[in-house]
Amino acid sequence: MAKIVVGLSGGVDSAVSAYLLKKAGHNVIAVFMRNWDSSLNNDFLGKKNEKNFTICPQEQDWLDAKVVAKQLNIPIFRIDFIKEYWDEVFSDLILKYQSGLTPNPDILCNKNIKFKHFLDYAQKVHNADFIAMGHYAKTDNGNLYAGADSLKDQSYFLGQLSKSQLQKTIFPLGNLHKSEVRKIANELGLINAKKKDSTGICFIGERKFTDFLQNYIPAQPGNIIDISTKKVLGKHIGIMYFTIGQRKGFGLSGMKEPYFVVGHNLKEKILYVSPQSEKKWLESDSLMAKNANFLSENFRNLDNLSAKFRYRQEAIPIKIEKIQDNSFWISYQKYQAITPGQQVVIYHQNQVILAGEIALLFRNGKKLDYLD
């Protein structure tokens, strides 16, 4: 049997993962990661509940993880990757927001922390054969597949992992649904069986987003402009606080119909909006993605490809039009609110074959220049 280090987060998914591996006869070691220090990282604005908020919620997770490890009778250790997370995840997040993009921190968090530094630690310190995580996804010989639970499938967040990382990773929940995981945890009497799923920024948690960003990026107000009429409709507090397709939070009142964010001009600090009746401004039919991660050698010969542009979106049919160096172009039927900075993940059936960061959007052959 293999020696496997499980990333035990304090949540139910990783707890059941550890149980299943031990039940299968493996030598299981639990390790809790702490990757964020609110005091050290100047994280004071944006607390979800000003009265009851604990400045370091991961401490409760650590306590839960210790109890679970005791219940499962497996050893547990704790490791900090606070500097690595700041340097290799959070700094990139801030830079992208300053550039007018909408990044997804979970992508880099998985690539650089959970499946890089954690894997290195597990191999060097514990001589692990594999690491395991509580993700709803599947691996097989370095290939990545969607999890059986379509509502919880997390393969989208894993699209930037290398084949070598995937070859050393096990996802025990890949063939299970969340309801089955909860049932197992309840039957075992695990203390976190009913614990709610984690939300918010990877390893940071829930925050009032606008306030949280102001810890690191000063507000830069500007005009809100109707993209069709060019009329100034109001003022915004900063482009970085808004994303394409957003319809609330920019303070427009007294309008005949709802308005959506459709783009921006970063240099002029302009936030472009459009009424609901003019949704064409949200549409694109092709894109260019950079930072390509090729997870299949045969993708050029595959038909019936589909793509996701955000988590929990139903995959839509696409065609790969061009590949050049580390970038690729795809086309699709007109689709709304695809957002630069987010990840596009391409599937053949349920296998992830290619992923990249959305860089440019096009409609009818023309670049959408109101996203600059």
Swiss-Prot record:
Any one GO CC term of the record: cytoplasm
Biological process terms in GO annotation: tRNA wobble position uridine thiolation
Reaction it catalyzes: S-sulfanyl-L-cysteinyl-[protein] + uridine(34) in tRNA + AH2 + ATP = 2-thiouridine(34) in tRNA + L-cysteinyl-[protein] + A + AMP + diphosphate + H(+)
Entry keyword Cytoplasm: yes
Claim: Transmembrane helix is one of the keywords in the record: no
Lineage: superkingdom: Bacteria
EC number, UniProt record: 2.8.1.13
Subcellular location(s) per record: Cytoplasm
Molecular-function GO term, any one: tRNA-uridine 2-sulfurtransferase activity
Residue numbers binding ATP: 7-14, 33, 134
SS bond list: 109-202
Chief location bin: cytoplasm
UniProt site positions, description: Interaction with tRNA: 135, 342
Region (Interaction with tRNA): 152-154, 310-311
Signal peptide region: none
Keyword tags: ATP-binding, Cytoplasm, Disulfide bond, Nucleotide-binding, RNA-binding, Transferase, tRNA processing, tRNA-binding
Top EC class, one word: transferase
Active-site residues, record numbering mapped to chain: 109 (nucleophile), 202 (cysteine persulfide intermediate)
Role noted for this protein: Catalyzes the 2-thiolation of uridine at the wobble position (U34) of tRNA, leading to the formation of s(2)U34.
Similarity remark: Belongs to the MnmA/TRMU family.
Name of the featured protein: tRNA-specific 2-thiouridylase MnmA
Species this chain originates from: Mesomycoplasma hyopneumoniae (strain J / ATCC 25934 / NCTC 10110) (Mycoplasma hyopneumoniae)
Gene: mnmA
